[in-house]
A protein has these predicted regions:
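Cys/His-rich short segments
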Residues: 1, 36-51, 217-220, 226, ...
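Short, Lys/Arg-enriched N-terminal segments with co-localized hydrophobic residues
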Residues: 2-13
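Acidic-glycine-rich active-site phosphate/pyrophosphate-binding loop
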Residues: 60-75, 110-125, 166
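A short glycine/serine-rich beta->alpha loop
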Residues: 76-87, 126-136, 176-183
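Conserved mixed alpha/beta catalytic, RNA-binding, or beta-rich assembly cores of soluble enzyme
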Residues: 93-104, 114-158, 162, 166
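Polybasic, low-complexity association/targeting segments
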Residues: 61-97, 182, 215
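A structural-propensity feature for long, helix-poor, extended segments
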Residues: 158-201
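Bacterial Sec-dependent signal peptides at the C-terminal "C-region" and cleavage site
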Residues: 27-39
Length: 235
């Protein structure tokens, strides 16, 4: 009888202990959810901001009729959520070039822009932020090669177009390198687009509009090189 009573007491204590454990685990789970929940008034991370900018690229580019890729680039970079620097530009450069290029083509040669812009985004987002510093290759310049590879349907097994795509990227990188650091994603985007405009005219026979560029964002760039920048505002 004593054994049975003792056993039942132990069983009861065990049930109570398990019940307490379940209650505590449930409370901890609720606390964890509350901690991970982002309040509406919190500031979005740079990654979320950049994603918002890129999400609207296709919509803006599909509606744009300009043959001036710098003009298109400016519209894309002027979105409220577009950061001063960052991998967003690895998509914007190629998208601006693609849009202006397509607007220069006759109707019979138009690209499937929805598919092309989706491809620019997919490839551009594979180029990591900081590639200019950590890999020695500016993502904005690489974006010119992405643009070229799409319009020429280039693959790793191509011949002449393989040369063209790599050459375009190399020339853009050369311009970026000659102007030195520290990095400025706006400056490097301008340099890359202007280089691609000349390259496309010479090698593909398509003439996009090439304007004079003046920077309007030097005041918000903490690393601005000032008068050394080729796009510094005129006094």
């Amino acid at each position: 009888m004593y054994f049975c009573t003792s056993f039942l007491d132990k069983e009861t204590r065990m049930k109570k202990t398990l019940l307490i454990i379940f209650v505590v685990v449930g409370m901890l789970a609720q606390v964890s959810k509350s901690c991970n929940r982002v309040p509406k008034e919190s500031t979005p991370t740079p990654e979320v901001v950049a994603e918002t900018t890129v999400d609207s690229v296709a919509v803006l580019c599909l509606a744009d009729t300009s043959r001036n890729p710098i003009e298109i680039l400016e519209r894309l970079m002027s979105q409220p959520d577009c950061p001063m620097h960052g991998p967003t530009h690895h998509v914007l450069v190629g998208a601006a070039l693609l849009t202006a290029y397509n607007n220069c083509l006759p109707d019979s040669a138009k690209l499937d822009m929805e598919a092309a812009l989706a491809e620019v985004r997919e490839r551009g987002e594979q180029v990591p932020g900081g590639a200019c510093g950590y890999m020695g290759a500016c993502g904005a310049s690489i974006s010119t090669g992405i643009f070229m590879s799409i319009v020429t349907r280039n693959t790793p097994f191509s011949t002449d177009t393989w040369r063209l795509c790599n050459h375009c990227t190399a020339l853009a990188l050369e311009q970026v390198a000659e102007n030195g650091g520290p990095r400025c994603c706006k400056r490097d985007s301008y340099l890359s687009v202007l280089t691609a405009i000349d390259f496309v005219k010479e090698n593909l026979g398509v003439e996009m509009v090439k304007p004079e560029v003046r920077c309007s964002r030097s005041q918000i760039n903490e690393q601005c090189i000032g008068k050394k920048c080729p796009f510094a505002p005129k006094p």
